Curated annotation (Swiss-Prot):
Protein function: Involved in the metabolism of galactose. Catalyzes the conversion of UDP-galactose (UDP-Gal) to UDP-glucose (UDP-Glc) through a mechanism involving the transient reduction of NAD.
GO molecular function (one): UDP-glucose 4-epimerase activity
Gene Ontology, cellular component aspect: cytosol
NCBIfam families for this protein: galE, PRK10675.1
Residues engaged in binding NAD(+): 11-12, 31-36, 58-59, 80-84, 99, 124, 149, 153, 178
One Pfam family linked to the record: Epimerase
EC code: 5.1.3.2
Alphabetical UniProt keywords: Carbohydrate metabolism, Galactose metabolism, Isomerase, NAD
Protein name: UDP-glucose 4-epimerase
Length: 338
């Protein structure tokens, strides 16, 4: 039996595929490569010594999904595929709803037809909107999202809740990520954004390597200890292991399960800059600029439910995140384009 990973050539997807292969799972990957490179899967094979079966295409393509389910004995689906830039989602809401909401719905419908009932969904802390309580627990209010990306994740969560009620065969696990950073310790796979990075650490590391002249810090007037936004940064390998734990715990269970995957600690943008400088002994020039639309001041998790139910905790600290990010960037100054 195999696991279908949509978006498996992407940043979080490729790291999760490594953990699945290391746990001796058979893996099938579907990715349209709009934000990723097929090289990531070649590197996954290098790391693990194992191959995945790869289909290039879109989750909106029902004929392709039917072909994948017909040709492979899929037992579970981990669904990463989707657009994920907060700022871009404000400019292109229709594309975000089409890819993230309609795409998820098409995938679920085809799973149902194929009799595949285990589903792990890559959600996001953005579903909490501007949180009323910090740290954020799974029972905190969702909705009130501040950008179309967050709204698209919230909408899919609502759809999944309704499907879980209506179709008791489904085992649905929703994983709400906080801010994934870092890279595999080998330096072979990591985050490789197209154009100017939307996420903080690739931005910092591209400044460090000389690809960008300086870091733009979006917003310095938030109500935080230094005025810059505070987030819960989690090492991507810890996040990947969380998917494996969720799959092992709930494969074959019925019902809906929701977990925060974070460290439970919040760091500001300037905290992260200082940590990167200290660990890697490099100066990062930065300038303070206006806030980005849709951004909030503070967001970090209470991950204790994942610890209790999945026996999962984030093991890698800030130093490891910085070290692995810089190792990946130095080894791959142009990302996968080298």
């Amino acid at each position: 039996m195999a696991i279908l990973v949509t978006g498996g050539a992407g940043y979080i997807g490729s790291h999760t595929v490594v953990e699945l292969l290391n746990a001796n799972k058979d893996v099938v990957v579907l990715d349209n490569l709009c934000n990723s490179s097929p090289k990531s899967l070649e590197r996954v094979a290098q790391i693990t010594g194992k191959q995945v079966k790869f289909y290039q295409g879109d989750i909106l393509d029902t004929a392709l999904l039917q072909k994948i389910f017909a040709e492979n004995q899929i037992q579970s689906v981990i669904h990463f595929a989707g657009l994920k830039a907060v700022g871009e989602s404000v400019q292109k809401p229709a594309e975000y709803y089409m890819n993230n909401v309609t795409g998820s719905l098409v995938l679920i419908q085809e799973m149902k037809k194929a009799g595949v009932w285990n589903f792990v969904f890559s959600s996001s802390a953005t579903v909490y909107g501007d949180p009323e309580i910090i740290p954020i627990t799974e029972s905190c209010k969702v909705g009130g999202t501040t950008n179309p990306y967050g709204t698209s994740k919230f909408m899919v969560e609502q759809i999944l809740k309704d499907i879980a009620k209506a179709t008791p065969e489904f085992s649905i696990t929703i994983l709400r990520y906080f801010n994934p950073v870092g890279a595999h310790e080998s330096g072979l796979i990591g985050e490789d954004p197209n154009g100017i990075p939307n996420n903080l650490l690739p931005y910092i590391s591209q400044v460090a390597i000389g690809k960008l002249p300086q870091l733009s810090v979006f917003g310095s007037d938030y109500e935080t200890h230094d005025g810059t936004g505070v987030r819960d940064y989690i090492h991507v390998v810890d996040l990947a292991i969380g998917h494996l734990k969720a799959l092992d715990r709930h494969e074959g269970d019925a019902g809906l399960h929701i977990y925060n995957l974070g460290t439970g600690s919040g760091y500001s943008v300037l905290d992260m800059v200082k940590a990167f400088e200290k660990v890697n002994d490099i100066k990062i020039p930065y300038k303070l600029v206006d806030r980005r639309p849709g951004d909030i001041a503070t967001c970090y998790s209470d991950p204790s439910l994942a610890k209790t139910e999945l026996n999962w905790t984030a093991a890698r600290g800030l130093e490891q995140m910085m070290k692995d990010t810089w190792h990946w960037q130095k080894k791959n100054p142009k990302g996968y384009r080298d």
